[in-house]
Amino acid sequence: MRVSGVVSGGVRVSARRLALVTAPRTGEAFESWVDRMARVNRCPPAEVATMMGLGLRGASADVRPPLFGVRSDDVVRRSVFAATGVSDERVDAMHLSVFEGGPLSVSAVLAAGRARRPSEGREWAAVHGSRACPCCLLVSGGVWQLWWKLSCAAVCPEHRVVLLDRCPSCGWVLRWGGERPRVVPAQWVRPPTCCANSVRGRPCSQWLPAVRVSRADGGTVEAQRRWLDVACGRVRPGLGGVEVAAGEWFAALRACVILLRLGLPRVLGRLPDVPGWCARVLLEERVERGAHGGRFGWGPASARAAASFLTVVMPL
């Protein structure tokens, strides 16, 4: 069975029925699902994406299309259904657009992609790249959660550990692609539990469940849980005892993060019960963001920074 797919580089590609299909998991990122499909079909993820009728190239070979993993459309849904039998609702649930109107503005992320600007800081989400919980990867067999791509993803509420930002072996941001960033690898199968970033033409072999990560502070875990409840629409947020829309609540959170950055270090002495580790991380992050003009409004630079902001700002 074939169905007309996404236009890529002026060429319309067609979806083909895949021999083996694995079902998406709850909360899984679209890219993660493509990786797992590639593994069971024993071919590179880019080949699976092509068979699913997805266009992976942007305006040129080194430009990644801004839509992939951010938002699906009718063409993508039809192509994916023809190739896998997965429903429109499940396809939509694997895209960052599920966070629209809350922690994310999809239109802003897409605009950043078209302008070739990094979105991981400016728009508070990483389109290409992700944080991860090594414990979750081990238990799930390599399912990467969609919310790990958000800049305020700090700790795993289930395993109570700080999320991993970078591979300790190659040093690259997880799932970024390494020296030759692409949407998904075109030359090798990317094991879902391994780094597999490109390093000198070969995939990094670091097995991520073996990486040691820090235990998370109890208060930070609770702050992350509350943040996730709002981000996923499970609770109605409030400000000053008044219920507000999720977009307003996240706008207030962003404003608090920016004001906290601008007020460092003096503001720390005026806030009650700030843990010492939070103060150290916040000061380090301020130096990193302040080293480049205009980045004070960007999202937390690391999982540890996100943990610090959640710990300090959420009680406010």
Question: Locations of the language-model features?
Answer:
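Basic, alpha-helical nucleic-acid-binding regions used in initiation and control of genome expression
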Residues: 1-316
